[in-house]
Regions:
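Class I SAM-dependent methyltransferase Rossmann-like catalytic core
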Residues: 2-25
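Conserved alpha-helix/loop element of class I SAM-dependent methyltransferases that forms part
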Residues: 22-41, 56
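Class I SAM-dependent methyltransferase SAM/SAH-binding core
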Residues: 44-95
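A short acidic, Gly/Pro-enriched loop at the edge of an enzyme's catalytic core
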Residues: 95-105
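A short SAM/SAH-binding and catalytic strip from SAM-dependent methyltransferases
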Residues: 103-118
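A short glycine-rich, Lys/Arg-flanked "PGG" loop and its adjoining helix->strand segment in the class I
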Residues: 118-133
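Conserved catalytic/acceptor-binding region of the Class I
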Residues: 135-207
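Conserved Class I S-adenosyl-L-methionine
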Residues: 175-177, 187, 192-265
Length: 265
């Protein structure tokens, strides 16, 4: 049974994936391109969500390559694809991968949610060919400074609701600080040539980025009430996210690339 808090059955999922893809795909594509990604590569996109990065990988590797997009619940990836890009309903924690020897394995904002993340990391490393690249991209959920607010109480309200959201995530086994631990975890897993780049931007009320916060808070509204957030606070939080006088730092995405040593068999 999944413990993933924002499961993909929620009607808010489409908006969540839209915000994630619009805000972070250009950055993620740059990180993936830096691995040497080329026609003919075999790639694994784990927890592919809306599938946009898996589709982009498919364009880069061309018909001579192969991309497998997995997800616990891939309902948001259902659309026509070329035959070399396939979608698999798959639990990365409990089900064996159909194959290994990948040139590139990528997962964005997946291991953060999985309590067994270190065991999953070992499986992802084992799925690489010697010399293959792993790219993990994760949030540090704790660094979200408010950059501008319409009044004195708004920053405190934002921080209160976000803290409740993070508390709900942690109760489901998420590690909200995972982003800052990924580099060391990948080194411990035996990867070399490690490099990290972090991306953040400002998100203004009413914009695409804060759509992520709208979607998340709406999907877990009941859990937020359990954390003591009142109906009135929740209503004011959503109004704040719609206010162009409010600007907050985006969640910082820490992208780490490493390679399986070439000498390994
Ligand atoms: C926050 S979303 C990120 C989606 C996408 N990677 C992105 O960054 O746009 C997390 C995704 O991981 C998937 N997921 C969660 N647990 C998983 C598991 N055990 N195995 C495979 N996918 C999982 C969820 O279904 C969801 O689609």
């Amino acid at each position: 049974m999944t413990r993933y808090l924002f499961d993909n059955t929620g009607v808010q999922t489409e908006n969540r994936f839209h915000s994630l893809e619009a805000c972070y795909d250009p950055f993620s594509r740059r990180q993936l391109a830096r691995t040497g990604l080329a026609p003919g590569w075999r790639c694994l996109e784990v927890g592919g969500g809306g599938g946009s990065l898996g589709d982009w990988l498919g364009e880069q590797v061309g018909p001579g390559g192969e991309v497998t997009i997995t997800d616990l619940d891939p309902r948001w990836t259902i659309r026509h694809r070329p035959p070399h890009v396939r979608v698999l309903r798959h639990d990365i924690v409990s089900e064996p991968l159909p194959t290994d020897g990948y040139d590139l394995v990528h997962a964005r904002l997946v291991l953060l949610h999985i309590p067994e993340r270190l065991a999953v990391l070992d499986r992802l490393v084992a799925a690489l060919r010697p010399g293959g690249a792993l790219v993990l991209e994760e949030f540090d959920c704790t660094w979200q400074p408010v950059l501008a607010a319409p009044d004195g109480g708004s920053a405190a309200l934002y921080e209160r609701v976000q803290a409740a959201l993070l508390a709900q995530l942690e109760k489901r086994g998420a590690d909200c600080l995972w982003g800052r631990k990924v580099f060391a975890a990948m080194a411990d897993a035996g990867l070399t040539d490690l490099a990290a780049t972090t991306y953040a931007e400002s998100w203004t009320g009413g914009g695409t980025g804060v759509g992520l916060h709208h979607a998340n808070a709406r999907q877990v509204a009941e859990g937020l009430r359990e954390e003591g957030v009142t109906e009135d606070e929740l209503a004011r939080y959503h109004a704040l996210l719609a206010d162009p006088e409010f600007t907050v730092n985006s969640l910082p995405l820490i992208s780490v690339t490493g390679r399986r040593p070439s000498g390994e068999r």
